[in-house]
Amino acid sequence: MNINREEIVELTETQGKAWGINHVRRLLALIDVIGEDQDYDKDVVWVATHLHDWGGYGEWKQPGVDHVERSLQVAGDYMKEQGYPEDFLDHVMECIGTHHSGDPNRSIEAILLSDADALDFLGVIGVLRIF
């Protein structure tokens, strides 16, 4: 499978500005730490991490529409246009759709994204409280 990482990064930077891409970089760094001893699909996590907030960015944002729901729409459309395999697309969509969820039946990839997103939201003080 071909993941056009340059295009995804460019779209995240263009639409999400500095906050979007910096948020993604922090999440990927956190996932490297919290997922260190885990067996997970790094491609799914990489794509889901970049796309999980797309519905809240720039021209993709729709007032009154939850950013998670909108991200599912935007990311789904993008991945279909790019020809991602259905099982990969479904896995990424699960990660995006549950990144604010406490559903215990999520995949390890979805849990890693959700946990990293929560830790990033808490900030440094919040992270230090955990350890």
Outline where the language-model segments fall.
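Amphipathic alpha-helical segments within well-ordered protein domains
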Residues: 9, 28, 32, 72, ...
